Amino acid sequence: RSEEDILKEISGAIDSGVTNIRIGGATDIYTYRAEGVRDLEYPVPNPDPISKVLYGAREDERLNILHVDNGNPSIVAENIEPSTEITKSMIDTLSDGAVLSFGLESADPTVHEMNWLNCDSEQLKIAIRHINDFGRVRGERGLPKLLPGLNFIAGLNGETKHSYDMNMKLLNDLRSEGMWLRRINIRQVEGQGFQEISESDFRSFKKKVRENIDKPL
């Protein structure tokens, strides 16, 4: 969709009385109108179009909350310079308390390979550090402007009990580095063609995350 089309929809929503808007419905805000979306493993972000949408939305004084949805950490990690321009635009325009959801799904390299996941743990760490570098500044409501959210999926092919250990190690590494996360989402995979999960291992992992990572953060 064009920038003009998105801004027209936002304007129409505001005309109808909407004051809080999240720009969603996309898997990665950094690849909006990016270079090589169909051809490159890591498309190169194009800062101008998304900046036009964000600043254009903010021009309407009736708009209260402006948030975004998802980001692909591998795109950020492999394209730091253009990603930084986009991140700065988000910091300038988004309401504080915004979350950029990162879908790692699993820290297990075997699971990553078997399920064609598009981000590995090292790329995730780079992206989380990047968002923390800019997003921890507090806004008008006293909340950090932009923090990463992290998504895990249980039940992907190749998963074992040790996959959860790798997930925990990643989270403990991030905590040791002093990284901030807004929230950690843990869910089970849906659909056919995936393996059964160990309910006890899954529940144990969720409990460890909530008690050892979520609460301290």
Locations of the language-model features?
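Canonical Radical SAM [4Fe-4S] cluster-binding loop centered on the CxxxCxxC motif
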Residues: 1-5
